[in-house]
Structures are given as structure tokens and as C-alpha cells.
């Protein structure tokens, strides 16, 4: 019934199910993937699983069967645009994207740099993207090319984020802007204490790596971490880092990710924009 209603409402003809998240096991549900509607007829080839999508003025690709969740984190759509605008407005030229996956925030940063240059700002700039998934980084590289950006402005590191942040700090490397968009550290409230320590550690390192006046876009996608707790974690990270800063904006899921009144845990995605005091 829901599948038919979705197709009727959107006017689309195909629907692919990705009910394969680990949380289904906690609820005693079996994993299910495949075509719900519009799949191949007998003897016919399967419809394409590789898609090109448009977000703002950018083109991005995904594989609906193999990528994380839907293949691309659609809930961060508005935050990526906010980041691009921030990079352009402040003419930020040294950007670090941690847990970059397929480079959504990296594309946003490069778009902001290009817009700043076209508006008369200083050209150049480099976006460094870190992830531990080789295939994700390959797609991130492809996204840079797909959008016509200069590959000389894009660096990619197949590495552990925590170790990389510590090495940057040791080497005296600093950045104008940093994105922390890690995977889910706390799937439930039972994991909150351990997750809080992990969030605090990476935020402390990121704040130490920011240039004075630099900007941190930091996120938690853990339902077990409330927005209030996340604020406290980041504030504590700043205190431990010896960094003074301001929260200039709170971020969350895009408007097409609503939350019900009776289920506050549905606000799984929360973000803060922190500017280090100059």
C-alpha cells in the first residue's frame, strides 16, 4: 500500500527497497532489498542501479543497491549548501572534510571556493578529504571531475580520521574550515557514554586544528545523543582544547526528514556551526 501511494504521489514508476540496516535485527525484522515496483520483467535486463542526481548546482552519483543507506546522505542536503555559502562568504581556502564518504561536503567546499573566486575573492584553495573506504574516495574523486573542479584543489586520504587529526596537530597543519560528519557512534542511548567520549575527542582535535576565525561544521547522526548532550560535548571539547568559540548556527535534517512530536529520538541528525574566536 505504501509503495503504491509513494509512486502515485511522486509520479515515479520504480521503487527499490533498502531495508537492510543493522537496527532491523534489534527489532527482530529480516533484511529486505530489491525492487518493490518497476523491476525487470522476465527475461529483461535489470533497470540501472547507478544514478546521477542533482543537488543545488552540483551533480553527484550513487549506486542504490551498494551504497550506505540510499547511496547518498540526502538528509545533509541543506547543510552542504550552508557550508558552500560559508566557504564563499568567508573566502575559506584550507578545508578539511573528515569522514567524507563520497565527497558531498567536499564538492560543496569546492563550489564555494569557485564562487568566491568568480566574485573577486582570492583564488586557489585546497580541500582535503579523509575516509577509510577506498571505493567511497574513488567516487568522491569522480564527483570533483563531474562538476568541473580543478583536481589540483582536491586531496584525498585513505586513512583513519583520528590518527590523521593527531598527525596534522603534530605537524603544525591548520585549516580554515573543518567538517566532522562521522558515522553513528551511538545507535541507542545505551551507547551514549562511549559515543560521547569519541565525539569529544574528534571535536577537541578539530578545534585545535582550526585557524583563529576558522569554522567547524560538526555533526552527530546518533539517535542516542540528544541535541542538548551534543552541545555539551562540543563545549567540553572546546574547553579541553583551550579554544574559545561561538556557536553561530544549529543544523539538522532537511525539511523532508520530519520528526513526530512523540518520538524526539527521531531528531537523529544534529549539527553545530562553531567559529573559533579570532
Please describe what each predicted stretch is:
Residues 135-179:
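S-adenosyl-L-methionine
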Residues 102-124:
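Conserved SAM-binding loop of SAM-dependent methyltransferases across substrates and taxa
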Residues 2-72, 81:
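Non-catalytic substrate-recognition/targeting regions of SAM-dependent transferases
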Residues 114, 210-212:
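Helix-to-beta-strand junctions that scaffold the AdoMet/dcAdoMet cofactor pocket
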Residues 95, 117, 123-131:
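Short beta-strand element of Class I
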Amino acid at each position: 500500500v505504501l509503495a503504491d501511494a509513494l509512486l502515485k504521489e511522486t509520479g515515479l514508476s520504480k521503487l527499490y527497497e533498502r531495508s537492510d540496516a543493522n537496527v532491523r535485527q534489534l527489532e527482530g525484522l529480516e533484511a529486505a532489498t530489491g525492487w518493490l515496483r518497476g523491476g525487470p520483467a522476465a527475461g529483461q535486463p535489470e533497470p540501472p542501479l547507478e544514478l546521477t542526481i542533482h543537488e543545488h548546482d552540483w551533480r553527484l552519483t550513487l549506486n542504490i543497491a551498494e551504497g550506505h543507506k540510499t547511496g547518498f546522505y540526502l538528509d545533509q542536503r541543506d547543510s552542504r549548501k550552508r557550508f558552500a555559502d560559508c566557504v564563499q562568504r568567508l573566502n575559506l581556502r584550507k578545508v578539511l572534510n573528515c569522514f567524507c564518504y563520497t565527497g558531498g561536503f567536499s564538492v560543496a567546499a569546492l563550489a564555494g571556493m569557485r564562487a568566491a573566486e568568480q566574485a573577486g575573492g582570492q583564488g586557489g584553495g585546497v580541500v582535503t578529504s579523509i575516509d577509510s573506504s577506498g571505493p567511497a574516495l574513488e567516487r568522491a574523486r569522480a564527483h570533483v571531475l563531474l562538476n568541473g573542479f580543478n583536481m589540483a584543489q582536491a586531496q584525498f586520504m585513505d586513512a583513519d580520521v583520528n590518527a590523521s587529526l593527531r598527525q596534522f596537530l603534530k605537524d603544525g597543519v591548520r585549516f580554515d574550515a573543518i567538517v566532522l560528519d562521522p558515522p553513528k557512534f551511538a545507535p541507542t542511548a545505551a551507547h551514549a557514554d562511549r559515543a560521547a567520549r569519541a565525539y569529544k575527542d574528534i571535536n577537541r582535535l578539530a578545534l585545535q586544528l582550526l585557524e583563529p576565525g576558522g569554522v567547524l561544521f560538526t555533526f552527530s547522526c546518533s539517535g542516542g545523543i540528544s541535541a542538548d548532550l551534543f552541545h555539551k560535548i562540543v563545549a567540553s571539547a572546546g574547553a579541553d582544547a583551550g579554544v574559545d568559540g561561538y556557536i553561530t548556527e544549529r543544523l539538522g535534517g532537511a525539511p523532508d526528514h520530519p520528526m513526530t512530536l512523540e518520538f524526539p529520538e527521531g531528531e537523529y541528525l544534529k549539527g553545530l556551526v562553531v567559529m573559533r574566536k579570532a
